[in-house]
């Protein structure tokens, strides 16, 4: 039977991608349905109990700047917060938080259940309704049919998921959850390229059986950071310490002696695993010269005794897992409460997607998260927000939107996926972005919140907070520009006392702030330059904008040059065999990737500058040279 109501957008899956997609579509005013196999696992942290990190924290800030959920949920659930790379430049500083799994899940569910325009329904999805190459609905396991104008697939590792522990394996979406077999088979019938990937998780350890007295604690930062631009530390629950231990030669010997029982090394697992989050057996073999690896013992929550040993993801048999754990300092008597495992699952080639994450072949069908070949909560959530937003726009007959590479890490992420695809689980790093100085955590709201407001994602409270911050920054910078001191000014001795070289000519506040020995806090304690802004976000922004102004201006010039290529569009139906002068290799790659623009074409491996020049000349001769707005 058909459900009596029609929806604008259906989201299939309630993980990090699905929950952000559902919230985005509903915030835009679209009638949204979130279909999940289990309402109790909405927002579940399936692997490590942490949010953020290098590159990943940047994505979380961008999600927040666009009105998303992840940062606010982390502020309500975070039990340890740290700023990584704190001693380095602002471009690579990143926030990371340990999170209480239960509190995080509760925060996500509360937000979903209180979001207008959003209905949640518990049923696995087994089929899509596709008519004339356009998706128009979904069918659940009990045969109930839902109609919608757009559908977003955020099914994580559930598509034909297979769990491996040693040489044994069984079907599963993750530990304790069934796989999605019928939906996987249905999707394989569509004109989409599909392959297999693998990821894994470590065994969980009972904290009561760990001798923490032997281990070094790792504490959070003071003052405690926050994730959301609207957050404050008073929202955080009680804070906890992590602890550090190490593998050793005994650990490595156990692993080497049992490689024949590893499903990965025995050839049972076909999917490719994540390069930047390898299993412990992979680390031991790939880095044979290392006699130890650092392992972080991360608490799973305030009310849980489970410890997540970050760094020993494994699919070795349970008896070997016990030997590995008990070979490490402090864990000699440890008990495992959940075994580690690897999971193989289907993913679909993201080169078959537009930058909006809509399928090139099935209208109204959007993909987000691990189904696109990514790994990580943050990457999934960012894609979910974008897919939900664009599904909402599609349902309203509006053009899709996607940020450029110079506008957001989200732009880098979707451009990498839709242009280059991936053969291994893709994770975000700051090194993937060409314009890191522009894409900092601290300015994510300055880059994206205004656009989020135009798109209908940003509510009045966030907009008022953002507008006030912008006003504070502009007024404070003007105030500093208007305050001048010269070598003979009254109180100049106090200023010279903190300068490496005394004033030799007149200078204003911004010129003093550009000096490496002066920061904003110090400047505003000097005569005439106080008082300081009370909003730490606005104060940080003033300092960064002033100190890096020259570098930022140069990077902006580079961006403007690149945009000329980025905005030169390529016809979607162009057969590159028509373009004389291109090599057979270039023709094959362009016909395979079908890039949207000259800029996108230039990032495809093997596409040379000479090939780009030939393309530009051909487009001009054919009268096809046009640029997007």
Swiss-Prot record:
SMART domains (UniProt xref): GIDA_assoc_3 (SM01228)
Pfam families: GIDA (PF01134), GIDA_C_1st (PF21680), SAM_GIDA_C (PF13932)
This protein's GO CC annotations: cytosol
Cofactor(s) for this UniProt protein: FAD
Coiled coil: none
Family (UniProt): Belongs to the MnmG family.
The protein's assembly and partners: Homodimer. Heterotetramer of two MnmE and two MnmG subunits.
Function: NAD-binding protein involved in the addition of a carboxymethylaminomethyl (cmnm) group at the wobble position (U34) of certain tRNAs, forming tRNA-cmnm(5)s(2)U34.
Matching PANTHER family: GLUCOSE INHIBITED DIVISION PROTEIN A, PROTEIN MTO1 HOMOLOG, MITOCHONDRIAL
Listed name of the protein: tRNA uridine 5-carboxymethylaminomethyl modification enzyme MnmG
């Amino acid at each position: 039977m058909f459900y009596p109501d029609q929806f604008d957008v259906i989201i299939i899956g309630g993980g990090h991608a699905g929950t952000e997609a559902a919230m985005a579509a509903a915030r835009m005013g679209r009638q949204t349905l979130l279909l999940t196999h289990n309402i109790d696992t909405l927002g579940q942290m399936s692997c490590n109990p942490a949010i953020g990190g290098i590159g990943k924290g940047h994505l979380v800030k961008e999600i927040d700047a666009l009105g998303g959920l992840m940062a606010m949920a982390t502020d309500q659930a975070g039990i340890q917060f740290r700023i990584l790379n704190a001693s380095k430049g602002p471009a690579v500083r990143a926030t990371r938080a340990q999170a209480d799994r239960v509190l995080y899940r509760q925060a996500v569910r509360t937000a979903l259940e209180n979001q207008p325009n959003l209905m949640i329904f518990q049923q696995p999805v087994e089929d899509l309704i596709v008519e004339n190459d356009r998706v128009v609905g979904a069918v659940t396991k009990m045969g109930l049919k839902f109609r919608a104008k757009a559908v977003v697939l955020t099914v994580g590792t559930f598509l034909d998921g297979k769990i491996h522990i040693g040489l044994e394996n069984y079907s599963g979406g993750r530990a304790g959850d069934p796989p999605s077999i019928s939906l996987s088979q249905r999707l394989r019938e569509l004109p989409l390229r599909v392959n297999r990937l693998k990821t894994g998780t470590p065994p969980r350890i009972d904290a009561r059986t760990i001798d923490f007295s032997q281990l070094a604690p790792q504490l959070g930062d003071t003052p405690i950071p926050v994730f959301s631009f609207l957050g404050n530390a008073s929202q955080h629950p009680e804070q906890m310490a992590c602890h550090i231990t190490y593998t050793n030669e005994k650990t490595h010997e156990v692993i080497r002696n049992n490689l024949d029982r590893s499903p990965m090394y025995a050839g049972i697992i076909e999917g490719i695993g994540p390069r930047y989050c390898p299993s412990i057996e992979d680390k031991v073999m790939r880095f044979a010269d290392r006699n130890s690896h650092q392992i972080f013992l991360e608490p799973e929550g305030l009310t849980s005794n489970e410890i997540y040993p970050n760094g020993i993801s494994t699919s070795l048999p349970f008896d070997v897992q016990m030997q590995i754990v008990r070979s490490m300092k402090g864990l000699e008597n440890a008990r495992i409460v959940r075994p580690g495992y690897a999971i193989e699952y289907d993913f679909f080639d993201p080169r078959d997607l537009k930058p909006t994450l809509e399928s090139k072949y099935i209208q109204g069908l959007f993909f987000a998260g691990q189904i696109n070949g990514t790994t990580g909560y943050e990457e999934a959530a960012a894609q979910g927000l974008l897919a939900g937003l664009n599904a909402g726009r599609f349902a309203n007959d509006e053009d899709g939107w996607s940020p450029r590479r110079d506008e957001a890490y989200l732009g880098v992420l979707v451009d990498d996926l839709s242009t280059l695809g991936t053969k291994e689980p893709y994770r975000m790093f700051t090194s993937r972005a060409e314009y890191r100085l522009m894409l900092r955590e601290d300015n994510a709201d300055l880059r994206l919140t205004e656009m989020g407001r135009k798109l209908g994602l940003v509510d009045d409270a966030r907009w008022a907070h953002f507008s006030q911050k912008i006003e504070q920054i502009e007024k404070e910078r003007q105030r500093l520009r208007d305050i001048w001191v010269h070598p003979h000014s009254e109180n100049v001795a106090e200023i010279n006392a903190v300068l490496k070289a005394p004033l030799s000519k007149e200078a204003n506040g911004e010129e003093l702030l550009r000096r490496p020995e002066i920061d904003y806090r110090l400047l505003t304690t000097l005569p005439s330059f106080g008082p300081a802004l009370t909003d730490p976000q606005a104060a940080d922004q003033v300092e960064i904008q002033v100190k890096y102004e020259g570098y930022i201006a140069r990077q902006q010039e580079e961006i403007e040059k690149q945009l000329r290529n980025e905005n030169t569009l390529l016809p979607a139906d162009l057969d590159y065999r028509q373009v004389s002068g291109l090599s057979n290799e270039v023709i094959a790659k362009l016909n395979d990737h079908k890039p949207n623009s000259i800029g996108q074409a230039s990032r495809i491996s093997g596409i040379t500058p000479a090939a780009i020049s030939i393309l530009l000349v051909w487009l001009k001769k054919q009268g096809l040279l046009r640029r997007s707005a």
